[in-house]
Amino acid sequence: MMDINEIREYLPHRYPFLLVDRVVELDTEGKRIRAYKNVSINEPFFNGHFPAHPIMPGVLIIEAMAQAAGILGFKMLDVKPADGTLYYFVGSDKLRFRQPVLPGDQLILEAKFISCKRQIWKFECQASVDGKPVCSAEIICAERKL
């Protein structure tokens, strides 16, 4: 389990772009992670997306899954951004949105390591709310040394 203070050690993102609030499961041997993003009406993106019917932007759901996958990658390598390693989101495959994410929802983020070749990492990711799938994708990240 990781609280927000430890998450901040493994992700370089900060408000308003830090999209993982808590890690509840992390298995480096099984190469999987489960994390939460608590979606509040106070999120800055709700001011414009959409004021009368607020919906979390899909690209931010993808980013939240990528951040959870990034934590898994850092933990698997036993490194942190402060050590000079970063992951850049470079693409996705098999991306699907299934239902909107609304204020008050708890977004459950799951990522499983698929492969790493030439510092290109691939993760199978899923986001859900109340046990219902919201989004799924294969997230592709590039590992870079600073």
UniProtKB/Swiss-Prot annotation:
This is 3-hydroxyacyl-[acyl-carrier-protein] dehydratase FabZ. The active site is at 49. Belongs to the thioester dehydratase family. FabZ subfamily. Keywords: Cytoplasm, Lipid A biosynthesis, Lipid biosynthesis, Lipid metabolism, Lyase. NCBIfam families: fabZ, PRK00006.1. It is found in: Cytoplasm. Its EC number is 4.2.1.59. Involved in unsaturated fatty acids biosynthesis. Catalyzes the dehydration of short chain beta-hydroxyacyl-ACPs and long chain saturated and unsaturated beta-hydroxyacyl-ACPs. The keyword Acyltransferase does not apply. It is an enzyme of class 4 (lyase). It comes from Pseudomonas fluorescens (strain Pf0-1). Signal peptide: none annotated. Its main location: cytoplasm. GO terms for cellular component: cytoplasm; membrane. One of its GO terms (molecular function) is (3R)-hydroxyacyl-[acyl-carrier-protein] dehydratase activity. It catalyses: a (3R)-hydroxyacyl-[ACP] = a (2E)-enoyl-[ACP] + H2O. One of its GO terms (biological process) is lipid A biosynthetic process.
